[in-house]
Structures are given as structure tokens and as C-alpha cells.
Amino acid sequence: MNNTHSSVLNKVAYLILHGFDKSYRWHSRITRDAQQRFEQALWQETQKAVKERIAIYERTLADAVGEIYQQVFPHQENNQFWFDLKTRYQKILSDHPQYELAETFYNSVLGRIFKHQKINDEMMFIMPTRCYLAGLQRHLVVHSFDTSGTVRRMLEDIFSQYHFDIAFQDMQRDLQHLDGALRARLNREQLASVHTVEMLKPVFYRSKSAYLIGRICMPDETLPFVIPLSIAEAETSGEKHKIVVEALLTERQDLSVVFSFARAYFMADTQHPAEVVAFLHELLPHKKKFELYIALGLYKHGKTVFYRNFLAHLEESNDQFSIAPGIRGLVMAVFHLPSYGVVFKIIKDEFPESKKITRQHVKDCYKLVKMTDRVGRMADTHEYVNFRLPRHRVEQALVDELLDCCASSIELTDEEVIIKHLYIERKMTPLNIFLEQQPDPALITSALNDLGLCIKQIAAAHIFAGDMLHKNFGITRGGRVIFYDYDEICYLTEREFRTLPKSDDPYAIDTLSVGPTDVFPEQFEHFIVGKKHLKQELKALHGEIMTAEYWQHMQAQSLKGDVPDFIPYNQAKRFVN
């Protein structure tokens, strides 16, 4: 290797690393400021910070690629240059505290340069370069607490390690609540057997809440130990806000809901994300590590880990990709691999006349959801380009379907089906299928009630779901209804909610002047669910969503800038309701 070649490799490798470091510093700064926003109850600033942090990656990526083009002409370099560059970059990452994220950033740079056409492990970090040994850096991210004294003393020790700039409203009351809740969860023998309590050092901030996350370690069992915090806002401008302990969560299901794929990303400041994810994975072993990276707002690396998991699953399975069950959409073609827990969604080339939207509009809607607090009711999605499937694993019926409705997004080779653009989303049972197949009337009622709550909670987040046919909702294994069809989603303030005119003339509605943003909620009862008895039951449970007055009230709340509380865990767990 000549000196010039080596010098250029060094320069480009360090440009990429500097780009990543800049990105992560910026990400960390916004994350670190979450404490101040929480303590000062700056809820609108919190929402802005979420959007700003998501946008950082693309901005720093564009800067890094631009700087590389000033140093080399990438397309004039042969493949050996890029093989050598990966090796050089790998060497300078040897002691980097976020090496796994830096590898993903490298992949993004090369993906941008080559428009994602050259995806191979010789040139990029398709597979990880090392096996992360969880626990070696545990002391950097975890506080360990002595449990030989009283429960009260242990709790006091825990709070002494978290340094807030405002006081608790009533610490003695909060300690009493926590003490009582822990004693209610563990019997005397279990309490006596607790040998350690470990708490993550970063505080996890999201929306109007903060979480202290840890675990109780016993010889035969380890339980989550999670303390949600909220702000009691000051009544006068001269006073400071106060912190309130909301609950104690000790069940994995409660923590799983807190880390749901349908919620906004946390802000948890750490320089050792892999160790934090490893700890969380021990608490939530049924969650994939890619889900936990994404929950921390490291969604680009989460996508990398997902893709690695996906490739491993392909090696271990033999079923075929097929059209997803359910009613086919007007805007998206949806398919799945039956043995895998996601669906793949491709924007169709053409939409029916009833959908007065464009391809870019659909992309903008999906971006809006990414940037919004999804309040546990809207599924997160992940965007990929040039996503490759082995052709022998794709059913011919699916190939034919994709070529028929998404031809501009599909490239076929003898070996692969290459999808130029798609979204990946968690797989759920479509609500219409659930309602058709569920024999238990109580579970049907529960699902319909949750459907209404889903629509209301999305509205409380200042979002109008748009196309609210029940086929556009899914239901999770836990019975939670989630919205997942975003092509008509918009802010509440972008719609005009109107009341239908009262008239005995059956043709009056045909002559009604309707603008492009007009919505008549009274019509919702006719199309949200299909069968008459389901319509009646939904109306009995949530009839207000079928009135213009309800939506006008929600618009007024949105215009005032109100940010409601969205408590992810069971309200019954709260100490003070």
C-alpha cells in the first residue's frame, strides 16, 4: 500500500468517525437537557427536542458525505479502496465507547455514497465485527445498593444517587408509598433474600414523565424495580415545580408496556449504550435488542441490529414470504414472512381516485408519525431502501402482486427480489380479523372499548387518524389496539369538523358543499366497524367520537398547546390518582 493511498484512507476514515462523534455529541446534548425540560415542565420544548434529535442523524450524515467528496472522488475508487477503508476504520474504533453505533454510521455513509447499491460485508459492517461481552462495563452504567439494612434506608440510598435541581413534593410520603408497595409485592422471606438492588445511572425521560429503572436481585428470581416520576407544577410563577413519585413497577409486563414499540423514544443520557441495552435486555428478555436501541432513540442502529437478526432468521427458517392476511390496502402492498414478527409495506405505484394523495404525501405522513409522541397507540415504522430478499423464498403470487401494483419499487434478479423502498412494522392481528374470529363477547367488547380509547388518545396527541376503518387497526397479544395505517393522518388543526345538516330530505346530503378538509364525525359510526351490533356497541362505549363537538373540543385543546399525560402502565399502580 503506497503512502498516498494510506493517507487518503486515514483521512476518509477519520472524517467518518468525526461525523459520527459530532452526531452522538449532538444527540447527547439534547438528551442531557431532558432533565432541565422535565424539571421546568417545558412540555412543548420537550416535543420539539424529540423532533430535533431524530433529525440530527441525517444532518450529520449529509455533512460527513459532503466532506468526503471534498477529499476523494468515491466512484473513481476501486473496490479494494473500500475494503481497505473498512479495515482502517475498524482499527481506529478499537477503544471507542460507542463502536457499534459508529459502525452503523459508517454503513450509512457508504450507503449514501453508493445509493445503497453495494451492500456486502467486505465493504460494510453488515455483520458486527466483535461480540459484545455484557457486564464488563456494568459499573459505568449501574448503581448497586446494599440491602442489609431496612427497605427505607435502601430507598433513601437510591434517591441520594440521582441529582435533581428541584425538590420532591413530599419525599417522606413517597418513601412510605414505595416501602408499602415493595412489601406488598414481596413476602418477608423474599425481602430477606434480596442481596442487591441495581439501578441504571441514566434517568429515562419521555413526555411528562421520568423513570428510574433497575432490578431487585434474589437468589432464585430477579424482578424489575422501576420508579416513575412526574412533576407537580407550581401554582404561582415564584415557586418551583416539585417531583412526585408516581408508582413502583415490579412486573415485567408493566415494564414491557413502558418500552412499547408504539411509544415515543426515551431520552436517557449514556456514553455506553451497549451496556445499557444489555442490562435492559436482562430485564426484558422477550424484547429484541434492536427494539431496545430504538427505544433509546438510537433508531438507526436499531435498524442495523434488526437487519442482522433478520438475516440470521432467514438462515434458520425455510418458510416463504407471502401476501399478508387481511383486506388489501388501497395505498400499500403488505407482505410478511409467517415465522417472523414484522410486516413489510411498500407504497403502490397508483392509488384509486378516492385517495387524493401522492407518494410523497404518504412518506410525509409516515415521517410525521416518527416525529410524534405515539402515545402507545401508533406503531413505529422503519424505512429501508434496496431491501433484498432471496427470490427462492418469495411466493410467486407475491412476486406477481408486487409487479402488478409496485413495479417501480421492485427489481428482480435470478437470485433476489430487491425492494427499492419499504417500511417495516410490528406484526399484529388486524382488528377486523380479530372481531370476526373472536368467539368471546367480553373480549370483543374489550377490543371495541380499546378501539375507542385508541382514537381518543391519538386525538389527545393532536393527531387525526384519518382513515379509521377497523382494518387499519391491529390488536397486540396483550389486547391493546394500535393504529398502523398512516396515509391520511394529519394534525387535528388541519381538518374542519362539521355537523351534518338536519333535513327530512333524503337527498340533502348529496347537495352539501364539502371542502377538501371537511370531516363529518356523525358518519364515523357507519364505517369504523362493519356489523350492525358492533356499530351499536362502539357507539354506546364511545359515542362522543361520532360528534363534531368532541373533535372541535380536541382541536381547541391542541390550539392551546395542552400536552396531556399519557401514563403507559396500569392506572391502578399509581400511588395518587
Curated annotation (Swiss-Prot):
The keyword Kinase belongs to this UniProt entry's keyword annotation: yes
Catalyses which reaction(s): L-seryl-[isocitrate dehydrogenase] + ATP = O-phospho-L-seryl-[isocitrate dehydrogenase] + ADP + H(+)
A GO cellular component annotation in the UniProt record: cytoplasm
Protein name: Isocitrate dehydrogenase kinase/phosphatase
Family: Belongs to the AceK family.
EC number: 2.7.11.5, 3.1.3.-
InterPro entries: AceK_kinase (IPR046855), AceK_regulatory (IPR046854), Isocitrate_DH_AceK (IPR010452)
Organism in which the protein naturally occurs: Pseudoalteromonas atlantica (strain T6c / ATCC BAA-1087)
Residues that, per the record, bind ATP: A324, P325, G326, I327, R328, G329, L330, K345
GO terms assigned for molecular function: [isocitrate dehydrogenase (NADP+)] kinase activity; AMP binding; ATP binding; phosphoprotein phosphatase activity; protein serine/threonine kinase activity
Keyword tags: ATP-binding, Cytoplasm, Glyoxylate bypass, Hydrolase, Kinase, Nucleotide-binding, Protein phosphatase, Serine/threonine-protein kinase, Transferase, Tricarboxylic acid cycle
Keyword ATP-binding in annotation: yes
Catalytic residues (positions): D380
Location(s), subcellular: Cytoplasm
Function: Bifunctional enzyme which can phosphorylate or dephosphorylate isocitrate dehydrogenase (IDH) on a specific serine residue. This is a regulatory mechanism which enables bacteria to bypass the Krebs cycle via the glyoxylate shunt in response to the source of carbon. When bacteria are grown on glucose, IDH is fully active and unphosphorylated, but when grown on acetate or ethanol, the activity of IDH declines drastically concomitant with its phosphorylation.
GO biological process, one term: glucose metabolic process
